[in-house]
Amino acid sequence: MINPELRDGRADGFIHRIVPKLIQNWKIGLMCFLSIIITTVCIIMIATWSKHAKPVACSGDWLGVRDKCFYFSDDTRNWTASKIFCSLQKAELAQIDTQEDMEFLKRYAGTDMHWIGLSRKQGDSWKWTNGTTFNGWFEIIGNGSFAFLSADGVHSSRGFIDIKWICSKPKYFL
């Protein structure tokens, strides 16, 4: 008969208890190591991609300023029809977020009036066509419900008059 005790006095079952724990710890260690490697590779890839990201040029009749493309119509329509036109171009009536945008739009629009993407219901605050509330950083002159840009600033009117319009959409990065 074989003696189940080893020379140091421990039972043979000791090895059967320790080996599975060693294998389990080894697997956990390997998984942690692989997780660190995968995370590091992802961070490096994202950082490299971000450095090489370039804005796509605005196409056709669209003009690029900063991170936006603008379209100035030659045709005239009411505010709602202008909004629909912009939507069909995957754009919105122009949203003016900065003084730089405002100066560019006024300079390019010249003396013509152009619908922009601000409207309000009677007694409500002004909202952009994307649903965000206008923060009031420029004055809107008049008591109408639809905003338009002219050479001397932003005015409001009833939306049924036919004037030119400006669409805007973001430049997309690749």
UniProtKB/Swiss-Prot annotation:
Transmembrane segments: 28-48
Matches recorded under SUPFAM superfamilies: C-type lectin-like (SSF56436)
Matches recorded under InterPro entries: C-type_lectin-like, C-type_lectin-like/link_sf, C-type_lectin/matrix_domain, CTDL_fold, NKR-like_CTLD
Changes after translation: N-glycosylated.
Pfam family, one: Lectin_C
Example GO BP: natural killer cell mediated cytotoxicity
Induction or repression: By phytohemagglutinin (PHA) in peripheral CD8(+) T cells.
Recorded consequence of changing residue 155 to A: Slightly reduces affinity for KLRF2
Molecular-function annotations in GO: carbohydrate binding; identical protein binding; protein homodimerization activity
Keywords recorded for this protein, A-Z: Cell membrane, Disulfide bond, Glycoprotein, Lectin, Membrane, Receptor, Signal-anchor, Transmembrane, Transmembrane helix
Positions of glycan attachment: 78, 130, 143
Gene3D superfamilies recorded: Mannose-Binding Protein A, subunit A
Effect annotated for changing residue 78 to A: Partial loss of glycosylation
Disulphide linkage map: 58-69, 86-167
Cleavable signal peptide: none
Domain called C-type lectin: residue spans: 65-174
Gene Ontology CC terms: external side of plasma membrane; plasma membrane
Known role: Membrane-bound protein expressed mainly on keratinocytes which acts as a ligand to stimulate the activating receptor NKp65/KLRF2, expressed on the surface of natural killer (NK) cells. Facilitates thereby dedicated immune recognition of keratinocytes leading to natural killer cell mediated cytotoxicity. Also plays a role in modulating the extent of T-cell expansion.
Subunit structure: Homodimer; non-disulfide-linked. Interacts with KLRB1. Interacts with KLRF2.
Name by which UniProt lists this protein: C-type lectin domain family 2 member A
The organism of origin for this protein: Homo sapiens (Human)
Gene that this sequence comes from: CLEC2A
